[in-house]
């Protein structure tokens, strides 16, 4: 068992370094003015401009038979459409009670993830801009479990390395 874990770790690290080397070469080839345009594109895709991320109207759906809580229907629809474009199954909207029966009981430790959570404005007003909190989890399963159990939807997540 130890050898398999070591092998997986080495493969992941080599994949990470290979991806980083390819990214570094691409950055060196680009002109100076282009990265500004690229960063604008990244900002617009990470948070959809037509959805208010601070509007709280929780929606519940199944994501590959696992419960998922969304901040509002607009964010859920955009992410579901993106999944369809990628050839994955769309979200299945369900009630909160039904969704909670699909929360994982236990999660194994996997690749850690960092997620962004919307924090309401200090006044508690719905739709008013607040802040974004970042939290780290042992795996995507742990994130989905935490989010559904606590009715705390996340906006985005990304895999990270346990440094």
Swiss-Prot record:
Entry keyword set: Signal
Cellular compartments per GO CC: extracellular region
GO molecular function terms noted in the UniProt entry: bioadhesive activity
Endpoints of the signal sequence: 1-18
GO terms, biological process: puparial adhesion
Protein name: Salivary glue protein Sgs-5
The organism of origin for this protein: Drosophila melanogaster (Fruit fly)
Originating gene: Sgs5
